[in-house]
């Protein structure tokens, strides 16, 4: 009898008693296991399986459509706190107002005003509010210059040969056989000197604040270090402000809203090593780059307002990934913004509802990868200006392969999204 009871215990342990004794067997003193108990056993198996799936999901936390992972990454690694944004704006406004007044007083014929552009003012800045971009609008008028379009995106700005112009801007121009051209380098040096004098007048008057000025190519960079603060996170904070001279022209013969009505040029020349389709028939150091910063800001201002979409959040996530990845970091913020403009403002209607963030994210990465593979990412406003001409073929191939790996491989994506902000 003991042997029989041992056998029954073994059958129950391996859940075989229902198979052998599917009917009651009173002669052996065996009662058939009740159905509710059997259901509890089956439910227990499902729970074990569910836990196993969850463990697998934790190992691969970004399957397609995983909105939660993107949202979490956006909060922990991408978004800038309101306090940080408020601090940067307050600090910038304080210093820029002093500089603006000095420039207005000491260079009334040349300095006009500041234009607040770039990712901070487009609400596309990520990680930290530590860099700002300002266009310095000069007072030179369009009817004083002849714009000579030399290559897509770049132009020479020649002073018109008129009696009123003959003694103007002598310190800012370079003469050649064709006339006098406004020099980006000379204009940048002039503005640096003007701002340096402004900074010297007040840098020792603001307590707990160190102000330095650096010559960063075409930009005059104001570096503000705040040594003390009411809050721990404010101590030793740095804010870098790039100030770039610009000419903002309006062709009044064109109707309002016409893309050709506004012509903006900044004191930035062609990058060294840029691949050009044809040799320049012009001295490259005299070229000014055409700018669309104000138009881009206008487009970005409208984002997500009508449909409460996730466009800005998606762009910020991509920018953060690109910035942190050694291979992708060869792409500039402007590359990402240009690709987004093409992607968002195409003829294809996209669903930007918040719950579609993960779908839009992967789809945009595919769009960017395809542009890079084709080695063609044209300026949104100048379709024959390829922004990838600044990169060599080897780097472009590496970027394309890296994007492809992130898109196709969930493990690679997991590595990106588990990296926390330092």
UniProtKB/Swiss-Prot annotation:
Keywords on record: ATP-binding, Cytoplasm, GTP-binding, Magnesium, Metal-binding, Nucleotide-binding, Nucleotidyltransferase, Transferase
Enzyme class, UniProt record, top EC level: transferase
Family annotation (Pfam families): Mab-21, Mab-21_C
Subcellular location: Cytoplasm, Cytosol
Keyword Isomerase carried by entry: no
Catalytic reactions of this protein: GTP + ATP = 2',3'-cGAMP + 2 diphosphate; GTP + ATP = pppGp(2'-5')A + diphosphate; pppGp(2'-5')A = 2',3'-cGAMP + diphosphate
GO CC annotation: cytosol
Listed Gene3D superfamilies: 1.10.1410.40, 3.30.460.90
Function: Nucleotidyltransferase that catalyzes the formation of cyclic GMP-AMP (cGAMP) from ATP and GTP. Catalysis involves both the formation of a 2',5' phosphodiester linkage at the GpA step and the formation of a 3',5' phosphodiester linkage at the ApG step, producing c[G(2',5')pA(3',5')p]. Acts as a key cytosolic DNA sensor, the presence of double-stranded DNA (dsDNA) in the cytoplasm being a danger signal that triggers the immune responses. Binds cytosolic DNA directly, leading to activation and synthesis of cGAMP, a second messenger that binds to and activates v1g246111/STING.
Disulfide bonds: none
Homology family: Belongs to the mab-21 family.
Binding-site list for GTP: 117, 242, 289-296
Transmembrane spans: none
Full protein name: Cyclic GMP-AMP synthase
């Amino acid at each position: 009898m003991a042997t029989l009871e041992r056998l029954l215990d073994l059958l129950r342990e391996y859940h075989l008693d229902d198979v052998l004794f599917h009917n009651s067997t009173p002669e052996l003193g065996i009662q058939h296991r009740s159905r509710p108990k059997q259901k509890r056993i089956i439910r227990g198996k499902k729970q074990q399986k569910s836990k196993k799936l969850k463990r697998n999901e934790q190992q691969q936390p970004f399957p397609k459509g995983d909105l939660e992972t993107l949202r979490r990454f956006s909060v922990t690694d991408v978004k800038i706190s309101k306090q940080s944004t408020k601090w940067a704006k307050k600090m910038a406004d304080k210093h820029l107002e002093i500089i603006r007044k000095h420039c207005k007083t000491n260079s009334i014929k040349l300095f006009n005003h500041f234009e607040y552009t770039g990712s901070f003012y487009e609400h596309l800045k990520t990680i930290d509010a530590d860099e700002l971009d300002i266009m310095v609008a000069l007072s030179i008028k369009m009817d004083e210059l002849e714009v000579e379009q030399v290559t897509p995106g770049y132009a020479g700005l020649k002073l018109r040969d008129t009696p009123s112009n003959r003694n103007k801007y002598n310190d800012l121009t370079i003469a050649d056989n064709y006339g006098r051209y406004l020099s980006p380098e000379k204009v940048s040096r002039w503005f640096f000197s003007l701002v340096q004098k402004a900074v010297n007048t007040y840098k020792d008057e603001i307590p707990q604040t160190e102000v330095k000025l650096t010559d960063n190519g075409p930009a005059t960079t104001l570096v503000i270090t705040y040594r003390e603060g009411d809050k721990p996170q404010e101590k030793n904070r740095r804010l870098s402000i790039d100030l770039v001279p610009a000419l903002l022209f309006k062709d009044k013969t064109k109707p309002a809203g016409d893309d050709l009505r506004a012509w903006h040029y900044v004191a930035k020349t062609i990058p060294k090593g840029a691949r050009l389709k044809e040799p320049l028939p012009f001295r490259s150091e005299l070229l000014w780059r055409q700018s669309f910063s104000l138009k881009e800001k206008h487009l970005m201002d409208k984002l997500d307002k009508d449909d409460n979409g996730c466009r800005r959040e998606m762009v910020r996530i991509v920018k953060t990934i690109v910035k942190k990845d050694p291979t992708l970091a060869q792409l500039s913020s402007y590359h990402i913004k240009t690709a987004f403009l093409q992607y968002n403002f195409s003829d294809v209607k996209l669903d930007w509802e918040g719950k579609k963030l993960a779908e839009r994210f992967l789809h945009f990465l595919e769009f960017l990868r395809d542009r890079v593979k084709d080695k063609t990412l044209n300026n949104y406003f100048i379709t024959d200006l390829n922004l990838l001409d600044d990169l060599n073929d080897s780097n472009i191939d590496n970027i394309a392969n890296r994007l492809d790996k992130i898109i196709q491989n969930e493990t690679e994506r997991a590595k990106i999204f588990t990296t926390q902000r330092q």
